[in-house]
């Protein structure tokens, strides 16, 4: 993968000199795959495609050691600091982000939250806002496909993904801060349509 000289120099500054006053955030993605096909980067594991409740794309972290827990091979992504970045904290997820996703998902099924759900269902749906983002949406798909509501599970998963993907498409990156993991590591999603292959590179030799 050929990079512009200025971009290559920036990567070298980060890796070899640990400089932080540049125009990019350096993000890390680790995998056990010896060959990483960026054309199919939204297929995060071999075999059948699986549910991505936080949206399709490639996930990174600014915490290299945390990233390495997911695989032996580490890749870099340079995210320009001028990018349009959506930052989600546990507080903002609980107070607004989850409710927005829930509203749009229910609308897809023509469910009126106030008229078409029981008191118990209302309590369950809103309780999920207090979980971590990935847990909230995993439990939402289980609730919608439960016998009480009875929607088809694969369809529910596709619906949640499509809603989240549409929200994420407005941004170059979605940055989850303090929403999960005991190490307080962040997680950054580069959405499918925002991913720039020229900024994705295998780790350079030390």
Language-model segments: which ranges?
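GIY-YIG-like beta-to-alpha core
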Residues: 58-66
